[in-house]
UniProtKB/Swiss-Prot annotation:
Signal peptide: none
Pathway in which this enzyme or protein is active: Membrane lipid metabolism; glycerophospholipid metabolism
Matches recorded under InterPro entries: 6-PGluconate_DH-like_C_sf, 6PGD_dom2, G3P_DH_NAD-dep, G3P_DH_NAD-dep_C, G3P_DH_NAD-dep_N, NAD(P)-bd_dom_sf
UniProt organism field: Brachyspira hyodysenteriae (strain ATCC 49526 / WA1)
Top-rank taxon, per record: Bacteria
The EC number(s) this enzyme carries: 1.1.1.94
Compartment(s) where it occurs, according to its Swiss-Prot or TrEMBL record: Cytoplasm
Protein name, as recorded: Glycerol-3-phosphate dehydrogenase [NAD(P)+]
Length: 333
């Protein structure tokens, strides 16, 4: 049994707290006083995990130092736009003998950096920084539905985190040394998931969904290889695994956003209707689109979602344009 500190009390942060508290001492940093009072008295937050009672052994705090101090493993689980601030907040308290894990699936909307790159640019010292990702709806994982994820980072440390945080038979962790690939797969699948929601909203059928997932994976692979990631990672849990579950399920915020876009709504209105809960694909779309444009990477689905989100492109016209592109080989390049 070790001490685990979790920075962030959204759906995924609370789900991880519920899982890891079965084996370890878990302390969760909560951003707002109102959420802290709710969680510390009722051990639930239906805005994120509806009808799920959290383990009473979980400790909640509004003091970030209290969550970080004495924690062998510190896990940041915030939206990507708040990740840099989370790193700034924990920097005075975290030390080289601790392990930092990012469980945020996104890219920095201003710089396009992965979360581990953001962390390394802010936190001084030489501590190990890893990434946790994979097909994992918070609502299911918190209930104990069998879930498998991957932790990416240096070999010895990722193996230690794998062995320490796995909670059989509910939560299985694999490890990978391709941290960049693990991060990219987890971030870019959110873009394709928005498209998946549009497909669902328009009731286009299984043929269209299969084509989207397959061609979407091609785009993720092109992007990942340009960043130095390994292609085999894209065929693992953080790649195709997360892509399938996020594109196919209404539990995904990104998928739900796409369904609402198909009704003619603007993404800002959808986020407001959902208590401000973030669809990470919005930020990932901006970062990936701009990177692809600068580096001449062929990502037509990403470009289409960018134009729908930010240029008010007509969805039916955009779909017609995608399906009318010049014929080409099926290969990645």
């Amino acid at each position: 049994m070790i001490n685990v500190g979790i920075i962030g009390a959204g759906g995924w942060g609370l789900a991880l707290a519920n899982i890891f508290s079965e084996k370890h001492n878990v302390k969760v940093w909560v951003h707002s006083e109102s959420s802290y009072k709710l969680l510390s008295t009722s051990y639930r937050n239906d805005n994120y995990l509806e009808n799920i009672q959290l383990n009473k052994s979980i400790k909640f705090t509004t003091d970030v130092g209290e969550a970080v101090n004495d924690s062998e493993i510190v896990i940041i689980v915030t939206p990507s736009f708040a990740f840099a601030d989370a790193c700034i907040n924990i920097e005075p308290y975290i030390s080289n003998d601790q392990i930092l894990v990012s469980a945020t699936k996104g890219l920095d909307r201003k710089t396009g950096k992965t979360m581990s790159e953001v962390a390394r640019s802010i936190i001084s010292g030489d501590l190990s920084i890893l990434t946790l990702s994979g097909p994992s709806h918070a609502e299911e994982a918190a209930k104990g539905v069998p879930t498998a994820v991957v932790v990416g980072g240096e070999k010895g440390v990722s193996e230690y985190v794998r062995d320490t945080l796995t909670v059989p038979p509910k939560f299985r962790i694999y490890n990978s040394t391709d941290q960049k690939g693990v991060e990219i797969g987890g971030a870019l699948k959110n873009i394709i998931a928005i498209a998946g929601g549009i497909v669902d909203g328009l009731k286009l059928g299984d043929n269209t969904k299969a084509a989207l997932i397959t061609r979407g994976l091609h785009e993720i692979v092109r992007f990942a290889l340009s960043k130095g990631a390994r292609i085999d990672t894209m065929y693992g849990l953080s790649g195709i695994g997360d892509l399938i579950v996020t594109c196919s399920s209404g539990l995904s915020r990104n998928n739900r956003l796409g369904r609402e876009l198909a009704k003619g709504k603007k993404y800002q209105d959808v986020i407001a209707e959902n208590h401000g809960q973030v669809a990470e694909g919005v930020y990932a779309t901006t970062a990936a689109y701009e990177y692809a444009q600068k580096n001449n990477i062929y990502m037509p689905i990403t470009e289409a979602i960018y134009n729908i989100l930010f240029n008010d492109a007509n969805i039916q016209d955009t779909l017609t344009e995608l399906m009318s592109k010049d014929a080409k080989s099926e290969g990645f390049f």
